Every structure is written in C-alpha cells, then in structure tokens.
C-alpha cells in the first residue's frame, strides 16, 4: 500500500502523515505546496512531493510515480479563513476535490476527504444531530463540505470510486498550533493556560460545539479506510462524536489542574455566528454500528494529556 496525503503540512495532515507512516512503515507520500515544505521528522521520515491540488496533471503524475492506491485529500481552508477568502476556498475545496476524484477514477485509487460539522446549518436539529438530516450551511466552508460529500458519493455510485469520509468535530491538538478555525479557541485556551496567560475567548458562554482530541480524529480517519466496505451503508460522510462543551465547561476543567487560570470573553462576531449555526452535539450511531467507531478520550482525559504535553513543549 502507498498513500498520498495532500495538505500534509496542515493542521490535520502533519499529524496524520506521521500516524500513517507509523502504521504503514513510512510508505506515505507527503503532498505539499511551495512554501509549506515538510520539516524535521515529517521531512525525514518518508518521501514528499510538491502537489498543487488545483493541478490534475500534477496529482496524476505523483500517483503514477509512487504507485499510490489511497489518497488522503486534506487540502482546504479553515472555516473563518474560508469566509475571508470564499473564492479561494471553493477553488481549493471543490476544484481540488474534483481533480483528486478524476485521478482516482482513472487510476483506481481510494479517496478519503474529511468533512465537518460545518455541513450543518441553523435549521438543522441542534442536539444529537442525526446522521441523515438537513444540510444547508451559510458559510463557504460548509458549502464546500456539503458539495464535497455529494460529489464523493456521486463518484462512488457512478464510477465505483472507493470514497469515504467522516464529519470531524473541532479537533484539539498539542502538536499543531491553531490556525483560524471556529473551534480553535479550544486549542488556544490550553496554550494560554500552560504559558500562564489570561485567555480572551472569542466564543460566547453557552455556545456548545462538538469537539474531539486529535488522536481520536486520526484514528477515525484511518479506521474508516480500513473498514469492511460491505458493511458501509453510508460513505460520505459519517458523524463521529467524542465530547461537547462550551467555553465555561472547558475553562473549569482546566482550573481543576491549574486553579490560577483566568479567562475573559472577547467575542469575535464572525466566529460566533459560525459557531451558532453548528450543532451542539452529534449522533454518531451509524459510525459505531457500521465500522465500530468509539472514541477513547473524554474532556477530562484530554485536558490532562494536553496540559502534560504542552508543559513539556514549553518547559513549564
């Protein structure tokens, strides 16, 4: 097996590439764009290639050169960034996905393209949002994710391409710094706590969103591609869930271990509006039943691990 991970130096890709290499003996090609070259262990642990997701020929040449049979297509702009640059978000998110699916159709590759809680909108059921429900987002990020789900399903039904996906909640990581996503406050807050800084929260109290610790997210992305296809009723895309909280809950959980931590609110209207359009929590029954999904971390175990890892990182 040889896997190409596009967006390999991004928020998810940098960690997913290393996880895949640990499982598949380094036989993973890290795709990147000029100016975002892999560094350190990511560079040294396996092959890498410049791949412009908007260039179908370049994708095809890379797939052919490395005999790739599975593509993890992670190239995308984050939610708040996509709102600032909607044209670029569509070009990368949908133009890039179309190119990947065309190459997969022609060359027999399986494709994983992550979706998101961003596919849902204001009139979606907010609590325990069902697997199959209304998807009408009001952000370009969400529009590209819904369109990506539909296009991926089309390529599976029409051309037999093995497309699979999960709807990621907000992903929380101690490895990759936050990069402008709506849920990134839940990463920033740990950084501030460990550095001994006051945290200014851009999301209002009582705003609940689904979140997940990155190790669970990486495992979900791998397990869905390893799942028995005969048992998959859904493909693009599965709800997956781990925990749901608002800023007060995560703040109080951090205070269990760092009592002097202090948080104030400085709400960002753009990110707040996006957050309010997303579900409070997801129903992931289908993922559990069809391919055995089960998270390993809850809020408290994540907090303990995040604080421990960041203290080592910042010598605290």
Regions found by a protein language model. Give the residues of each.
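Short, small-residue-biased leader/transition segments that mark boundaries at the very start
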Residues: 1-3, 247
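N-terminal Rossmann NAD(P)H-binding glycine-rich loop of SDR-like oxidoreductase domains
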Residues: 4-23
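NAD(P)H-binding glycine-rich loop region in Rossmannoid oxidoreductase-like domains
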Residues: 53-92
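Conserved Rossmann-fold NAD(P)-dependent oxidoreductase catalytic core, especially the SDR/UDP-sugar
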Residues: 73, 98-140
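Conserved beta-loop-beta element that borders a ligand/cofactor-binding pocket
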Residues: 116, 150-175
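A conserved pocket-lining segment of Rossmann-fold NAD(P)-dependent short-chain dehydrogenase/reductase
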Residues: 134, 165-178, 188-212, 216
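Glycine/proline-rich active-site loop of Rossmann-fold NAD(P)-dependent oxidoreductases
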Residues: 146, 159, 172-187, 214-215, ...
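C-terminal substrate-binding subdomain of Rossmann-fold SDR/epimerase-dehydratase oxidoreductases
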Residues: 202-204, 209-316
């Amino acid at each position: 097996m040889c896997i190409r991970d596009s967006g390999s130096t991004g928020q998810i890709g940098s960690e997913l590439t290393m996880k895949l290499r640990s499982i598949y003996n380094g036989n993973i090609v890290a795709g990147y764009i000029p100016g975002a070259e892999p560094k350190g262990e990511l560079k040294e642990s396996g092959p890498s290639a410049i791949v412009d997701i908007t260039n179908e020929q370049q994708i095809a040449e890379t797939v052919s050169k490395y005999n790739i049979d599975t593509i993890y297509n992670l190239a995308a702009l984050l939610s708040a960034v996509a709102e600032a640059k909607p044209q670029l978000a569509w070009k990368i998110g949908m133009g890039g996905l179309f190119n990947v699916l065309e190459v997969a159709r022609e060359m027999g590759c399986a494709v994983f393209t992550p979706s998101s809680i961003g596919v849902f909108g204001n009139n979606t059921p907010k609590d325990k949002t069902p697997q199959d429900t209304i998807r009408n987002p009001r952000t370009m990020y969400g529009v590209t994710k819904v369109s990506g789900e539909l296009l991926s399903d089309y390529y599976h039904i029409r051309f037999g391409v093995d497309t699979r996906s999960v709807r990621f909640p907000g992903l929380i990581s101690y490895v990759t710094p936050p990069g402008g996503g709506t849920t990134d406050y839940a990463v920033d807050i740990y950084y501030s706590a460990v550095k001994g800084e006051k945290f200014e929260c851009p999301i209002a109290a009582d705003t609940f969103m689904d979140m997940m610790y990155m190790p669970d997210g990486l495992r979900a992305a791998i397990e869905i591609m390893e799942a028995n296809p005969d048992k998959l009723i859904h493909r693009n895309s599965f709800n997956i869930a781990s925990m749901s909280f608002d800023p007060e809950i995560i703040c109080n959980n951090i205070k269990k271990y760092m009592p002097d931590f202090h948080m104030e609110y400085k709400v960002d209207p753009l990110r707040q509006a996006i957050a309010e359009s997303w579900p409070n929590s997801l129903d992931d029954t289908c993922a559990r039943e069809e391919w055995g999904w089960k998270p390993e971390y809850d809020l408290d175990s994540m907090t303990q691990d995040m604080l421990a890892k960041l203290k080592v990182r910042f010598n605290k």
